[in-house]
A protein has these predicted regions:
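Glycan-recognition and catalytic regions of carbohydrate-active enzymes
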Residues: 86-89, 146
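Active-site rim elements
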Residues: 84, 104-110, 161-162, 170-174
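Short glycine/acidic-rich loop motifs that flank beta-strands on beta-rich extracellular proteins
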Residues: 3-12, 20, 36-49, 55, ...
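Surface beta-loop-beta hairpin patches that serve as ligand-binding interfaces in beta-rich domains
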Residues: 132-192
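Right-handed parallel beta-helix
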Residues: 1-7, 20-38, 58-71, 92-103, ...
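A structural motif corresponding to the C-terminal lobe/cap of the Radical SAM core domain
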Residues: 100, 108, 143-146
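Alpha-helix capping and helix-loop boundary segments enriched in small/acidic/polar residues
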Residues: 17-22, 53, 87
Protein backbone atom coordinates (compact mmCIF):
# COMPACT_ATOMS: atom_id res chain seq x y z
CA UNK A 1 0.00 0.00 0.00
CA UNK A 2 1.21 3.54 -0.56
CA UNK A 3 -0.03 7.06 0.07
CA UNK A 4 -3.05 5.72 1.96
CA UNK A 5 -4.51 8.40 4.25
CA UNK A 6 -5.65 5.85 6.82
CA UNK A 7 -2.54 3.69 7.08
CA UNK A 8 -1.74 0.11 6.12
CA UNK A 9 -4.38 -1.89 7.99
CA UNK A 10 -7.35 -1.67 10.34
CA UNK A 11 -7.92 -4.78 12.44
CA UNK A 12 -11.25 -4.33 14.19
CA UNK A 13 -14.02 -5.92 16.20
CA UNK A 14 -17.04 -4.24 17.72
CA UNK A 15 -17.23 -5.16 21.38
CA UNK A 16 -21.01 -4.92 21.28
CA UNK A 17 -21.38 -7.64 18.63
CA UNK A 18 -22.07 -11.04 20.20
CA UNK A 19 -20.79 -13.22 17.35
CA UNK A 20 -17.38 -14.83 16.96
CA UNK A 21 -15.69 -11.46 16.57
CA UNK A 22 -12.19 -11.07 15.17
CA UNK A 23 -10.00 -13.96 16.34
CA UNK A 24 -6.80 -15.31 14.85
CA UNK A 25 -6.28 -12.72 12.12
CA UNK A 26 -2.87 -12.57 10.45
CA UNK A 27 -1.31 -9.57 8.72
CA UNK A 28 1.96 -10.59 7.10
CA UNK A 29 4.35 -9.81 4.24
CA UNK A 30 2.89 -6.40 3.40
CA UNK A 31 4.83 -3.34 2.27
CA UNK A 32 3.57 0.08 3.30
CA UNK A 33 5.24 3.17 1.84
CA UNK A 34 4.17 6.67 2.87
CA UNK A 35 0.87 5.56 4.42
CA UNK A 36 -0.96 7.18 7.36
CA UNK A 37 -0.88 10.69 5.92
CA UNK A 38 -4.45 11.90 6.59
CA UNK A 39 -4.33 15.73 6.63
CA UNK A 40 -7.91 16.30 7.81
CA UNK A 41 -9.99 15.48 10.85
CA UNK A 42 -12.13 12.38 11.26
CA UNK A 43 -14.87 12.13 13.89
CA UNK A 44 -12.13 11.36 16.42
CA UNK A 45 -9.81 14.14 15.29
CA UNK A 46 -6.65 13.92 13.22
CA UNK A 47 -5.95 10.20 13.29
CA UNK A 48 -4.14 7.84 10.93
CA UNK A 49 -2.11 5.08 12.54
CA UNK A 50 -0.17 2.79 10.20
CA UNK A 51 -1.52 -0.23 12.08
CA UNK A 52 -4.82 0.38 13.89
CA UNK A 53 -6.31 -2.29 16.13
CA UNK A 54 -9.77 -1.31 17.35
CA UNK A 55 -11.88 -3.30 19.77
CA UNK A 56 -11.53 -6.72 21.42
CA UNK A 57 -9.63 -8.56 18.67
CA UNK A 58 -7.97 -11.72 19.97
CA UNK A 59 -4.86 -13.66 18.97
CA UNK A 60 -3.81 -11.38 16.11
CA UNK A 61 -0.46 -11.96 14.38
CA UNK A 62 1.30 -9.01 12.71
CA UNK A 63 4.44 -10.50 11.20
CA UNK A 64 7.13 -9.56 8.68
CA UNK A 65 5.57 -6.36 7.41
CA UNK A 66 7.63 -3.44 6.16
CA UNK A 67 6.36 0.00 7.19
CA UNK A 68 8.40 2.72 5.50
CA UNK A 69 7.10 6.04 6.77
CA UNK A 70 8.12 9.23 5.00
CA UNK A 71 8.24 12.66 6.66
CA UNK A 72 4.76 14.02 7.39
CA UNK A 73 3.99 17.16 5.40
CA UNK A 74 2.29 18.96 8.32
CA UNK A 75 3.15 18.94 12.03
CA UNK A 76 -0.43 18.04 13.05
CA UNK A 77 -0.56 14.76 11.07
CA UNK A 78 -0.69 11.70 13.34
CA UNK A 79 2.65 9.97 13.81
CA UNK A 80 1.57 6.70 15.42
CA UNK A 81 2.98 3.53 13.93
CA UNK A 82 0.64 1.32 15.97
CA UNK A 83 -2.50 2.32 17.86
CA UNK A 84 -4.57 -0.21 19.78
CA UNK A 85 -7.68 1.43 21.14
CA UNK A 86 -11.21 0.70 22.31
CA UNK A 87 -14.28 -0.12 20.30
CA UNK A 88 -16.25 -1.27 23.33
CA UNK A 89 -13.23 -3.30 24.42
CA UNK A 90 -9.49 -3.68 23.84
CA UNK A 91 -7.38 -6.19 21.94
CA UNK A 92 -5.84 -9.17 23.71
CA UNK A 93 -2.89 -11.39 22.76
CA UNK A 94 -1.51 -9.52 19.75
CA UNK A 95 1.90 -10.63 18.47
CA UNK A 96 4.18 -8.28 16.48
CA UNK A 97 7.08 -10.30 15.07
CA UNK A 98 9.98 -9.34 12.78
CA UNK A 99 8.37 -6.19 11.36
CA UNK A 100 10.39 -3.24 10.05
CA UNK A 101 9.28 0.15 11.37
CA UNK A 102 11.23 2.87 9.54
CA UNK A 103 10.44 6.44 10.64
CA UNK A 104 12.39 9.62 9.76
CA UNK A 105 10.52 11.69 12.38
CA UNK A 106 9.57 10.93 15.96
CA UNK A 107 6.70 8.42 15.96
CA UNK A 108 4.81 6.48 18.59
CA UNK A 109 3.39 3.10 19.54
CA UNK A 110 0.14 3.46 21.51
CA UNK A 111 -1.04 0.24 23.08
CA UNK A 112 -3.42 1.90 25.56
CA UNK A 113 -5.26 -0.76 27.59
CA UNK A 114 -4.75 -3.67 25.21
CA UNK A 115 -3.41 -6.74 27.00
CA UNK A 116 -0.80 -9.46 26.49
CA UNK A 117 0.96 -7.79 23.56
CA UNK A 118 4.14 -9.53 22.44
CA UNK A 119 6.89 -7.83 20.44
CA UNK A 120 9.65 -10.08 19.15
CA UNK A 121 12.49 -9.34 16.74
CA UNK A 122 11.14 -6.11 15.26
CA UNK A 123 13.33 -3.40 13.72
CA UNK A 124 12.80 0.07 15.22
CA UNK A 125 14.59 2.27 12.70
CA UNK A 126 14.07 5.78 14.04
CA UNK A 127 12.84 7.53 17.16
CA UNK A 128 9.74 5.63 18.33
CA UNK A 129 8.15 6.65 21.63
CA UNK A 130 6.28 4.03 23.62
CA UNK A 131 8.47 1.26 22.30
CA UNK A 132 7.51 -1.90 24.19
CA UNK A 133 9.87 -4.50 25.55
CA UNK A 134 11.26 -6.50 22.64
CA UNK A 135 14.13 -8.77 23.74
CA UNK A 136 15.20 -9.50 20.16
CA UNK A 137 14.42 -6.05 18.75
CA UNK A 138 16.99 -4.05 16.81
CA UNK A 139 17.62 -0.32 16.45
CA UNK A 140 19.64 -0.41 13.24
CA UNK A 141 19.98 -2.30 9.98
CA UNK A 142 22.86 -1.83 7.56
CA UNK A 143 20.99 -3.95 5.02
CA UNK A 144 17.91 -1.70 5.13
CA UNK A 145 20.01 1.45 4.95
CA UNK A 146 21.73 -0.02 1.90
CA UNK A 147 18.35 -0.80 0.30
CA UNK A 148 17.09 2.79 0.61
CA UNK A 149 20.40 4.61 0.11
CA UNK A 150 19.59 5.81 -3.43
CA UNK A 151 15.98 6.77 -2.67
CA UNK A 152 15.13 7.44 0.99
CA UNK A 153 11.42 7.83 0.08
CA UNK A 154 11.31 4.08 -0.55
CA UNK A 155 9.30 4.30 -3.76
CA UNK A 156 12.11 3.42 -6.15
CA UNK A 157 14.55 1.82 -3.73
CA UNK A 158 12.04 -0.79 -2.54
CA UNK A 159 10.57 -1.46 -6.01
CA UNK A 160 12.58 -4.71 -6.21
CA UNK A 161 10.00 -6.19 -3.81
CA UNK A 162 7.17 -5.87 -6.36
CA UNK A 163 5.96 -7.45 -9.56
CA UNK A 164 3.91 -5.58 -12.14
CA UNK A 165 0.54 -7.28 -12.64
CA UNK A 166 -1.62 -6.55 -15.68
CA UNK A 167 -5.32 -7.04 -15.13
CA UNK A 168 -7.55 -8.26 -17.96
CA UNK A 169 -6.88 -6.51 -21.25
CA UNK A 170 -4.33 -4.20 -19.67
CA UNK A 171 -6.79 -1.53 -18.64
CA UNK A 172 -5.50 -1.86 -15.09
CA UNK A 173 -1.92 -2.33 -13.96
CA UNK A 174 -0.84 -2.74 -10.36
CA UNK A 175 2.15 -3.63 -8.24
CA UNK A 176 2.01 -6.73 -6.05
CA UNK A 177 4.52 -7.94 -3.49
CA UNK A 178 6.58 -10.82 -4.89
CA UNK A 179 6.30 -13.67 -2.41
CA UNK A 180 9.79 -15.09 -2.89
CA UNK A 181 11.46 -11.67 -2.89
CA UNK A 182 9.77 -10.48 0.32
CA UNK A 183 10.72 -13.75 2.04
CA UNK A 184 14.35 -13.25 0.94
CA UNK A 185 14.23 -9.62 2.10
CA UNK A 186 13.30 -10.65 5.64
CA UNK A 187 15.89 -13.43 5.67
CA UNK A 188 18.54 -10.86 4.66
CA UNK A 189 17.38 -8.59 7.48
CA UNK A 190 17.93 -11.43 9.97
CA UNK A 191 21.38 -12.34 8.63
CA UNK A 192 23.15 -9.12 9.57
Amino acid sequence: SHDNDGGLVLICNSGTYHGAGNQGSAVQYNVSINDAIRPRATRSGIFSANIHIAGPCKNTLVQRNLLHVNPKTEPFIDRSIITSDSWDGYADSTVFRENVFFVPQESEIRLNRSTRNTFDGNYYLGNIKGRPEDPNGRNASDYYNQCISKDPSGFNSLSFLFDTVIIGDGSAVLKAVNRDTIHRFFEMMKEE
